[in-house]
Amino acid sequence: MKTHLPKIDVQRRAWRVIDAKGAVLGRLAVQVSDALRGKDKPTFTPHLDAGDFVVVINASEVVLTGNKETAKTFMSYSGWKGGERYRTVAEVRAKHPERLVLHAVKGMLPKNRLGDRLLTKLKVYPGAEHPHAAQQPVVTAYAG
């Protein structure tokens, strides 16, 4: 069976808003990554960018199960000797709550140029306000 190649001029990129309030982080990230890739569309093609723009609001109120709030750590490396820095989820949530969602979604996208391009279509905001009202986004319910 041949891979279906949709015409570029036919594709319409919709804008979706997903409220992360009370949503489990991993389940939310699956829904967001599928929308970014376009896996819920009949024109899905693995090597093409066919997804929609996704705006995630209330990222600071996302939920992690178990004791991941204190046990899970994020590591960053400055490039210098002894430059490893470990932060817990609670520390990341206090300073940059949108990075929790970004990190989870990035891990579910392809590890190539297509994944980098898809990630630019994700907009995450810690509160309920977002500057994308002019794009007339459709509110998508969190299915978790």
Predicted regions: what they are:
Residues 102, 109-131:
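C-terminal structural segments of small proteins and small subunits
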Residues 1-103, 113, 131-144:
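Ribosome large-subunit tunnel/peptidyl-transferase-proximal elements
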